[in-house]
Regions:
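Helix-adjacent hinge/juxtasegments
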Residues: 55-56, 63-78
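Core segments of cupin and vicinal oxygen chelate
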Residues: 9-51, 56
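N-terminal beta-strand motif that seeds the catalytic metal site of vicinal oxygen chelate
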Residues: 1-15, 72-77
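Short, well-ordered turn and helix-capping elements at secondary-structure junctions
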Residues: 30-32, 56-59, 101-107
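A short, local hydrophobic-aromatic micro-motif
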Residues: 4, 29, 73, 100-101
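Vicinal oxygen chelate
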Residues: 13-14, 75-108
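Amphipathic alpha-helical "stalk" segments
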Residues: 35-43, 48-50, 61-63, 77, ...
Length: 108
């Protein structure tokens, strides 16, 4: 068995697409748009074959995100070494992203 892909709804579809391309080396398809529902998505492919679908619908509600709750926990990406993680973290901070936690070698 193989997980084919993970799908995430995002607020800013183009911003999310550009983030994964710039920082994590994703390759993107041309995108999908259903004009009847205004659903839009991109499939992003990564070097090891993993795929992520990012999606957007106009009627999605952006609810507050609580850290301590059941359900979806996280998605983890490997960039190959601790040095690459540290360099990517520094680049993200320099580009104005908040680093909420980490980088870490293990969770919990």
């Amino acid at each position: 068995m193989k997980i084919e892909h993970i799908a995430l709804y995002v607020e800013d579809l183009e911003g999310a697409r550009n983030f994964f391309i710039k920082y994590l080396g994703a390759k993107s398809n041309e995108g999908y748009h259903n004009p009847q529902t205004d659903f839009r998505s991109y499939f992003l492919s990564f070097e090891d074959g993993a795929r992520l679908e990012i999606m957007q619908r106009p009627e999605m509600v952006n609810l507050p995100k609580e850290a301590a709750r059941t359900g979806y926990a996280h998605i983890a990406f490997s960039v190959g070494s601790r040095e690459k993680v540290d360099a990517l973290t520094a680049e993200l901070k320099a580009d104005g992203y908040d680093v909420v936690s980490g980088p870490r070698i293990t969770g919990d």
